[in-house]
Amino acid sequence: MEETFTEITPQQAWEMMQNEDAVLVDIRDMVRFSHSRPQGAFHLTNHSYGKFLDEYDYDEPVIVSCYHGVSSRNTAQYLVEQGFERVYSVKGGFEGWVRSELPIELGY
């Protein structure tokens, strides 16, 4: 059976960040990430992937968020294939995060 990721709600993602030291990676473009993002998010891009590998271990929970919860699935699956053991994708992405009224950071 192929290992895969798990889809979770924005609220579940926030709880994992608080209780399990999960890292939330935001894969949206730089302009949107710079404007507003989930509180504590790491901006994961092709350029920041090396830094991400330096800062986080393969056994740490990783939560992937995008715009609407679609492209995060591909990134989540990629991270599983790279050896990350606990990978999650946020249903509804950043849009769902905002609708759930979870903490965000604004500005640069």
UniProtKB/Swiss-Prot annotation:
Active site: C66
Rhodanese domain location: 18-106
Domain of life: Bacteria
UniProt xrefs under Pfam families: Rhodanese
The enzyme's E.C. designation: 2.8.1.1
Reaction(s) catalysed by this chain's protein: thiosulfate + hydrogen cyanide = thiocyanate + sulfite + 2 H(+); thiosulfate + [thioredoxin]-dithiol = [thioredoxin]-disulfide + hydrogen sulfide + sulfite + 2 H(+)
Broad enzyme group: transferase
Record-level Gene Ontology MF annotations: thiosulfate-cyanide sulfurtransferase activity
UniProt keyword annotations, A-Z: Cytoplasm, Transferase
Presence of keyword Calcium: no
GO biological process per UniProt: glycerol metabolic process
Location relative to the cell: Cytoplasm
One Gene Ontology term, aspect cellular component: cytoplasm
PROSITE patterns: RHODANESE_3
PANTHER family: FAD-DEPENDENT OXIDOREDUCTASE, THIOSULFATE SULFURTRANSFERASE GLPE
Family in the record: Belongs to the GlpE family.
Function field: Transferase that catalyzes the transfer of sulfur from thiosulfate to thiophilic acceptors such as cyanide or dithiols. May function in a CysM-independent thiosulfate assimilation pathway by catalyzing the conversion of thiosulfate to sulfite, which can then be used for L-cysteine biosynthesis.
Name of this protein: Thiosulfate sulfurtransferase GlpE
Organism: Glaesserella parasuis serovar 5 (strain SH0165)
Lineage: Bacteria, Pseudomonadati, Pseudomonadota, Gammaproteobacteria, Pasteurellales
